[in-house]
Structure formats: C-alpha cells, structure tokens
Amino acid sequence: MSLIGRLNLGRRFCTAVPRRSEDIMSNPDCRPSDLCLRVSYLIRCVGDLDTAAKYARLAVFTSIKSESTTTICQSIIGGMLRDKRLKDAYDLYEFFFNQHNLRPNSHCWNYIIESGFQQGLVNDALHFHHRCINSGQVHDYPSDDSFRILTKGLVHSGRLDQAEAFLRGRTVNRTTYPDHVAYNNLIRGFLDLGNFKKANLVLGEFKRLFLIALSETKDDLHHSNYENRVAFLMATFMEYWFKQGKQVEAMECYNRCVLSNRLLVCAETGNALLKVLLKYGEKKNAWALYHELLDKNGTGKGCLDSDTIKIMVDECFDMGWFSEAMETYKKARPKNDYLSDKYIITRFCENRMLSEAESVFVDSLADDFGYIDVNTYKTMIDAYVKAGRIHDAIKTSNKMIDATLKEVSHLF
C-alpha cells in the first residue's frame, strides 16, 4: 500500500507517541502564535525542516487550538512535501490529525492530494479526496485550490472527462462562480490534444456559468473580474495558435480580449499574457502591456505583482540587457512591497555581476525595514568566494550570524 493510502481521517490511539510537551523538548513554550512564528522562521528563513518539525509537534499541546495551531501543521507538512520528504510529511499528518486529533484545514488536504498526483498515484489521491469530503471535518473543502489541483492532476494523467465532471459537479449551484484556473487546466488539456472545438466549448461553458452566477449574486466585484478572467483563458488560446504558427489568429485573440476592450488588466491575467507574448516574440506588445500595468499600479485601475516584475527582469537577463534589468527592477521596486531584494541579488550573482549584486545588498542592509534571509547572505558569500574576495565573504558571514542571532533571540 502507498504512503498516501495509509493515511487515516479518523483518530487512532497509539502509545508510541509523546503524551506531554516535555517528551519533545525541555521547557517548551506552547503558545500558538509564538510557536507559529518560530516554525515559519525555521522553514522560510533558515530552511531547517528537522528543527521546524520538532517545534511543530508542540502544536498538539497548545492549550488553545487556534488558527495558528492549524497554520503550524499546514506549514511543516507543506514544507516537507516541497522538499520531497514524503514519509516525513505523512508521518506529521498522522501525528497531528490522527494520533492527536487536531483538525486540518483544506490546505493540508490539498498538499496530500497534490503529492499523490505528483507520484502518479491518481486513484489514491482521488480516494483520499472523497474521504475528505465524506468526513465533513473541514467546512471549506473542496476549495478553489482543491479543484485546481484535481483538474491539473487529472488532465496530466489523461483523465480529461473526469476533470470535466468535477467542474460540472461543482457549479450545480447557480451562485457558484466557476474557477478560471481550474477551467484553464481543462482547456489546456484539450488544446494539447489538438481538440480546439472541445476547448472552445469549455470556454463557452465557463462564460455561461460565470454570467449565471453574476445575474444571481449581483456582485460588482465579480462583474469587473469577468473580462479579466476571460482574458486569462484567452492567453491559453493565444499560445495554441502560436504553436500552430498562426500568429495572426493569436494576436486577434489578444486584440479582441485586451486592446479592443481597453481592458484594465489585473496582475494574474497580465502575467499570463506577458509570458505568452514574450515566449513567441511579441516583445513590443509585452513591454507596452507591462508599462501600462506599471503606470496604473496603485491607481485602482490596474496592478502588477512581484511575479510581473520578475517576468520582465528575467526577459532583460535572457536578452543580455543587464543595465535594463537593473533599471526595470529599480523603477518597479517602490510600487511593490512584496518583491524581495533576494531575487535581483541572486540573478546578478548568477550572471557574475557582483558589483551590482553588492549594491542592492548594501542598500538592503541599510534599510531599517528590510529583512535579508539566510539564503541571500549565503548567495553573497558564495559570490565573494568565487571572486576570491575572502575577506568580504568572512565579513558577510559574520553579519549573517549577527542577524540570525538577533532574530533567534526575539523568537526563541
């Protein structure tokens, strides 16, 4: 039996598990919010999953089972699965939810199902999904993310009919909006098989269901989202036409859904369009769209996110436009609070542009509100060593130790 097949959804008594927090570590602090911060720090900033797992196990002994308690479980299970440590992830799932009867959230179940698909265990993943529904433990399962994972996994496995049935079953309620990413998975699956007619029917079904839900709910926010969601799907049709060598048809899709409508593109849709335009040589249109997103960001008329900026900076690096990469980054950086300097520092180091990386790194150190994680320090240390600047490598290493000790003293 596979690991995922062994997971239970019911409580199971086992004597070989810790019964007190002191069985895990001495003098434990089991306050949920503080424990959550520690686990998150160990996963994201240090990358020490083993120590994070040790602290995460204390979650079962928190006096108040809050949202933070569930987030701890979600974070460590997700971290283990991203690191391909499947047995450790499943052992933690068993420990939290079966041996100690904590209540999972939809993210925990989604992680397990996604890992099943990634291993090719389609039937096991589907069986686990159905058991999750039947258990009734989580009120918001299946979520939008659940359907995205299910449709992607089923399409990848060649089970397009099953994926379509999942989506059809979800939208029986007239007030339920169809999810554009899940529908895009199905559309892409049919287009990859060359079945344009069926893909077009799925697009039409998405539009029909969206408009029905809109008429029932009278939701102004979703009304403004409708054209963006359709444009997101049209990016997949654009790529289909480009692959066929039919540039005119591809750009007709773009003109029809964006230019002729003067669509104020959201970040998610913009990113999908930018990737296709750049991939198939429509660079002038891509840069025009990017500058429109940049100009309208923060005005309430349009937006970009950190991925938008990375797409265009990556394009500069791919073309060998290094000064333009820095200029693009610097212009966009003040308009996005979530873009980490780690990204541009890493890209400069990858391209042996140590002086440029050092410039951004020094600015980050001087920023009182900035935060540099351990991996960014390590990137700079490696770059200094490769350049033969051992003194700078040692100095940066000492700064990393000081910053880490300061952070640890606050958290632990």
UniProtKB/Swiss-Prot annotation:
It is found in: Mitochondrion. Residues 1-18 form a transit peptide. Coiled coil: none annotated. The keyword Nucleus does not apply. It comes from the Eukaryota. Keywords: Mitochondrion, Repeat, Transit peptide. The keyword Kinase does not apply. GO terms for biological process: response to oxidative stress. GO terms for cellular component: mitochondrion. Its main location: mitochondrion. Pfam families: PPR. PPR repeats lie at residues 69-104, 105-139, 143-178, 179-213, 230-264, 266-296, 305-339, 344-371, 373-407. PANTHER family: EXPORTIN-2 CENTRAL DOMAIN-CONTAINING PROTEIN, PLASTID TRANSCRIPTIONALLY ACTIVE CHROMOSOME 2-LIKE PROTEIN. Belongs to the PPR family. P subfamily. This is Pentatricopeptide repeat-containing protein At3g60980, mitochondrial.
